[in-house]
């Protein structure tokens, strides 16, 4: 049977320092400051301000401008077309350009140019 007041005394072999040293007490720590809600609110406010600054910088910042430049270029690289390589190039004469314009296939600046090169129009994007 179990008695409520009876607790056996620990042996000296198990706890030999029981009577020699007093138990240490933890130093009193000041209570911690809440659940961190003010810090979380400050972090969220910083990110919101950063997002607003980014939106304003993109909206009012430098804009991209597009321009066109006519550059003299070689014909495009040879590509196989249904297994046939296009290797014979010739410049269109004024009569060829006139025929294509009547058929609705006229390409601007497709006539002969300086040094036998055909000019092409390339877009340039800059700040």
From Swiss-Prot:
PANTHER family: SMALL INTEGRAL MEMBRANE PROTEIN 33. It comes from the Eukaryota. InterPro entries: SMIM33. It is found in: Membrane. The keyword tRNA processing does not apply. The gene is Smim33. The keyword Transferase does not apply. It comes from Mus musculus (Mouse). Glycans are attached at residue 15. It is a single-pass membrane protein. This is Small integral membrane protein 33. The chain crosses the membrane at residues 38-58. GO terms for cellular component: membrane. Keywords: Glycoprotein, Membrane, Transmembrane, Transmembrane helix.
